[in-house]
């Protein structure tokens, strides 16, 4: 992939050289025909034809969006003025107008010719708007116009006017105009991506690789177109070499182109701008063809319409007949059923009448009244007997209730008597309790007296003992003195 | 030595009054307990008396002789006096009525007494008793009317009896069919 990209870059450099030469020729034509409007148209055609060559070879390697590719290339340029213009060009049309003023101020040397071109470009924008071109296309076309001015100013310094070269350019323009019919807007977008490879930035290469995978199917078609254009470009290069003759000039031009990659974009933009009117005309023709085709289709549809209508009418005419026949048959069947049901009803009604008559006869014959009378008599007797028995039972119950009442009264009397007895007994009990208390008191008193007597007795006994002891001692004392008297003798 | 002797004496002297008091207490309690027992016996007697009439009052069957006599009197009246059936089938004399009524009542009472029912009140048995009496009344009345037709002595009575016999034939056949 990298090798292919390098080879494509080299080819792009060669193409740029050719483009620059053609651009210088265009400038010469512009100078010769300043007053007329036809000169501007011719310039546009040249730019469109040149842009065709540039667009397709670049598309070989790098498909994708133009906007993304456009910005990084600007950074590589040396001149500050060009940078300002190109950055602003991406913005709205109002910004572009301001840039146009800046161009006038900057380029004093070529003020006259540039001013005229600017004046003519403004109506281009109006025509495009009238042509109902999309806003995106307007932006691109306006950008291309301003780029053309810059590129033309730059080239005029290095190139001199040559009559032979102008003639050859005219021939080349004819060939390119014939080819422009096959061109689409896509090459313009691809054109911007090509310089990325020449700048040699690694990040951009990665992005391109990813884009290539996405657009594989598109690349095959573009390769075919590229091969056809490549052969044409080689022929042109041969012709240019023959007429120039000076090898030194060609070598110097190549070096300039290689050093400044931005110019290639400028030339591309210029050619793309000139290409617009042809593409617009072609688009108009295509639109007309589409409209005509649509009208033809409409006429065909109108011609075809009556046929299905006839078929529909036929179907409408045919379809109801069998339905009607079936409905009529159903109605007839239903009527028959109704008649049958009516006859059945009549028969049943007759049966019902017969049954009613038979029931009436049976009633009269059986004599229900007698049976009713007997039943009533039975019920009467039953009721009477039950009444008697119930009444008797009630009387018995009443008598029993009376007995019970008497018993209750007797019981009450007994209860009263028992209560009276209880009262008496309670009184007696109270008396007995009182007596018991009295007795207890008496016992207490008795015990007290007994204790006193006991004390007295004990005291008396002790006294007597004391007296006895004294007596005994006296007796003993009398006995003891006798032995003493005997001893003295 | 003396103090101890005094204490012993005191302890010896105390028991007699306690024994006396205990005897008095026992004498006090005995009459109350006897009276209470008498109360309990009285209450139980009252309860028994209350239960007996309740049992009697709840049962309607079997009826007493007085009720049966009352039923007999009613039957005799219905047979002897005029009524719808008497107008149709004729009335009976008092003597015949009494005999017929007794037979009917005895038979019905027998059937009812033989019947067994789960009800303790005897209401169902009473209903059966009444139905049996009613059936036998009708049978007896019809039989008497037929007999009178056979024994007819008066011409007017004969004509009436003949009409009655014609009328009786129908219901008799109906009864047979109904029985079948």
Curated annotation (Swiss-Prot), chain A:
Disulfide bonds: none annotated. GO terms for biological process: nucleus organization. Residues 459-489 form the KASH domain. GO terms for molecular function: protein heterodimerization activity; protein homodimerization activity. One of its GO terms (cellular component) is nuclear membrane. Its main location: nucleus. Residues 49-73, 195-264 are annotated as: Disordered. Expressed in seedlings, roots, stems, leaves, and flowers. A motif (Nuclear localization signal 3) lies at residues 104-105. Keywords: Coiled coil, Membrane, Nucleus, Transmembrane, Transmembrane helix. It is a single-pass membrane protein. It is found in: Nucleus envelope; Nucleus membrane. Residues 323-446 form a coiled coil. The chain crosses the membrane at residues 460-480. InterPro entries: WIP1/2/3 (IPR044696). A motif (Nuclear localization signal 2) lies at residues 83-84. A motif (Nuclear localization signal 1) lies at residues 80-81. PANTHER family: WPP DOMAIN-INTERACTING PROTEIN 1, WPP DOMAIN-INTERACTING PROTEIN 2. Homodimer and heterodimer with WIP2. Component of Ran complexes at least composed of WIT1 or WIT2, RANGAP1 or RANGAP2, and WIP1 or WIP2 or WIP3. Interacts with RANGAP1, RANGAP2, WPP1/MAF1, and WPP2/MAF2. Interacts with SUN1 and SUN2. Interacts with KIN1. Core component of the LINC complex which is composed of inner nuclear membrane SUN domain-containing proteins coupled to outer nuclear membrane WIP and WIT proteins. The LINC complex also involves nucleoskeletal proteins CRWN/LINC and possibly KAKU4 and the cytoskeletal myosin KAKU1. Interacts with WIT1 and SUN2. Interacts with WIT2. Mediates and enhances the nuclear envelope docking of RANGAP proteins mediated by WIT1 and WIT2 in the undifferentiated cells of root tips. As component of the SUN-WIP-WIT2-KAKU1 complex, mediates the transfer of cytoplasmic forces to the nuclear envelope (NE), leading to nuclear shape changes. The KASH domain, which contains a transmembrane domain, mediates the nuclear envelope targeting and is involved in the binding to the SUN proteins. This is WPP domain-interacting protein 1. It comes from Arabidopsis thaliana.
Swiss-Prot record, chain B:
Residues 44-147 are annotated as: WPP. Residues 1-26 have a biased composition (Low complexity). Gene3D superfamilies: WPP domain (1.10.246.200). One of its GO terms (biological process) is lateral root development. Expressed in roots, stems, leaves and flowers. It comes from the Eukaryota. Its main location: nucleus. Residues 1-61, 140-180 are annotated as: Disordered. The keyword Nucleus applies. It is found in: Nucleus envelope; Cytoplasm; Nucleus; Golgi apparatus. Residues 27-36 have a biased composition (Polar residues). Binds to FPP proteins. Interacts with WAP, WIP1, WIP2 and WIP3 through its WPP domain. Interacts with WIT1 and HSP70-1. The WPP domain is required for the nuclear envelope localization. This is WPP domain-containing protein 2.
């Amino acid at each position: 992939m990298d090798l292919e990209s390098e080879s494509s870059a080299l080819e792009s450099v060669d193409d740029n050289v050719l483009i620059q030469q053609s651009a210088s020729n265009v400038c010469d034509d512009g100078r010769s025909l300043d007053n007329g409007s036809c000169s501007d148209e011719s310039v546009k055609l040249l730019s469109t034809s040149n842009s065709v060559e540039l667009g397709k070879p670049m598309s070989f390697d790098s498909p994708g969006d133009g906007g993304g590719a456009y910005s990084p290339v600007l950074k590589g340029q040396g001149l500050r003025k060009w940078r300002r213009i190109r950055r602003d060009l991406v913005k709205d049309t109002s910004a572009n107008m301001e840039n146009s003023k800046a161009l006038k101020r900057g380029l004093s040397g070529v003020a006259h010719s540039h001013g005229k071109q600017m004046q003519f470009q403004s109506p281009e924008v109006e025509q495009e708007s009238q042509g109902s071109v999309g806003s995106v296309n307007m932006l691109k076309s306006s950008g291309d116009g301003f780029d053309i001015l810059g590129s033309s100013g730059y080239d005029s310094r290095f190139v001199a006017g040559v009559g032979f070269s102008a003639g050859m350019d005219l021939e080349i323009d004819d060939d390119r105009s014939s080819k422009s019919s096959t061109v689409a807007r896509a090459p313009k977008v691809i054109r911007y991506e090509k310089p990325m490879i020449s700048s040699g930035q690694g990040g951009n290469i990665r992005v391109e690789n990813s884009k290539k995978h996405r657009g594989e199917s598109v690349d095959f078609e573009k390769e075919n177109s590229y091969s056809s254009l490549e052969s044409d470009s080689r022929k042109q290069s041969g012709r240019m070499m023959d007429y120039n003759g000076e090898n030194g000039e060609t070598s110097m031009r190549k070096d300039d182109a290689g050093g400044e990659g931005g110019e290639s974009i400028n030339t591309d933009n210029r050619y793309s701008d000139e290409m617009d009117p042809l593409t617009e005309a072609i688009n108009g023709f295509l639109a007309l063809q589409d409209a005509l085709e649509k009208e033809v289709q409409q006429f065909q549809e109108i011609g075809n319409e009556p046929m299905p209508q006839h078929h529909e009418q036929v179907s409408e005419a045919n379809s109801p007949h069998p339905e009607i026949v079936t409905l009529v048959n159903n109605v007839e069947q239903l009527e028959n059923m109704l008649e049958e049901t009516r006859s059945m009803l009549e028969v049943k009604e007759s049966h019902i009448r017969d049954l009613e008559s038979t029931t009436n006869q049976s009633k009269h014959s059986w004599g229900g009244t007698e049976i009713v009378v007997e039943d009533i008599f039975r019920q009467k007797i039953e009721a009477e007997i039950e009444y008697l028995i119930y009444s008797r039972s009630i009387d018995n119950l009443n008598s029993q209730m009376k007995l019970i009442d008497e018993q209750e009264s007797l019981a009450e009397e007994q209860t009263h008597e028992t209560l009276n007895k209880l009262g008496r007994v309670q009184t007696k009990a109270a008396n007995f309790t009182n007596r018991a208390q009295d007795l207890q008191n008496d016992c207490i008193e008795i015990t007290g007296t007994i204790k006193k007597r006991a004390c007295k007795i004990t005291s008396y006994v002790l006294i007597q003992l004391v007296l006895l002891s004294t007596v005994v001692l006296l007796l003993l004392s009398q006995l003891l003195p006798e032995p003493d008297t005997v001893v003295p003798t | 030595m003396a103090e101890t002797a005094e204490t012993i004496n005191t302890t010896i002297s105390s028991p007699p009054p306690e024994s006396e008091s205990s005897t008095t207490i026992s004498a006090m309690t005995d009459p109350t307990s006897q009276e209470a027992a008498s109360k309990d016996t009285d209450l139980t007697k009252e309860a028994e008396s209350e239960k007996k009439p309740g049992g009697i009052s709840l049962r309607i069957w079997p009826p007493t002789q007085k009720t049966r006599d009352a039923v007999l009197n009613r039957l005799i009246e219905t047979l002897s006096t005029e009524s719808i059936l008497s107008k149709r089938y004729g009335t009976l004399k008092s003597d015949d009525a009494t005999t017929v009524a007794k037979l009917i009542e005895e038979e019905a009472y027998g059937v009812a007494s033989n019947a067994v029912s789960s009800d303790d009140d005897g209401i169902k048995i009473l209903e059966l008793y009444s139905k049996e009496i009613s059936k036998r009344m009708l049978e007896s009345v019809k039989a008497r009317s037929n007999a009178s037709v056979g024994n007819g002595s008066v011409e007017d009575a004969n004509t009436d009896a003949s009409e009655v016999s014609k009328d009786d034939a129908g219901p008799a056949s109906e009864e047979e069919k109904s029985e079948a």
